[in-house]
Amino acid sequence: MKEKVQSALDNYVLAYMNNDKSLFRSLWDDEAVFEDPVGAEPCKGIEAICAFWDFGHAEGMEIKPTNVETIICANEGILKAVMEVRNSNDNSGMNIAIVDHFIINDAGKIVTGRAFWNEDTISQPTDIKSMDIFIDDFKDRG
């Protein structure tokens, strides 16, 4: 099982690194639930999870994980990373330090994902313009 969990986490990172929505979609069980950030209305089911991807990858947006660390225990995994969010339209961005918790089923699909981050884990790179984000707005992404 450890290999299935590690593969799911590795491919999750790869999907973001390559801006690959198809790979991202393939990682999730059809009935999965994804809460990002914790406290937001969860995305329930593959269509809602893919809509979340679209929300974060609007025109000109890229999200690249760096400083990635994983911990695997049984069928669960922790992914710790810095998500470098960049908007090429206006050269703005931010870095979000995240801790994601995933539960993987026997088929190797993610059934539950929870992303832990808040205003205190957001930092501003010095070489680009600030990207304003308000957690409450993010939670109400509709």
Describe each model-derived feature in a short phrase.
Residues V33-C43, F55-E59:
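A short gly/proline-enriched turn/hairpin at secondary-structure junctions
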Residues M1-K4, C50-G142:
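A beta-strand edge to alpha-helix "cap/lid" segment located at domain peripheries
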Residues M1-S26, D30, M131-G142:
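Short, low-complexity N-terminal intrinsically disordered segments enriched in polar/charged residues
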Residues Y12-A15, E35, R86:
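Alpha-helix C-capping/helix-to-loop hinge sites
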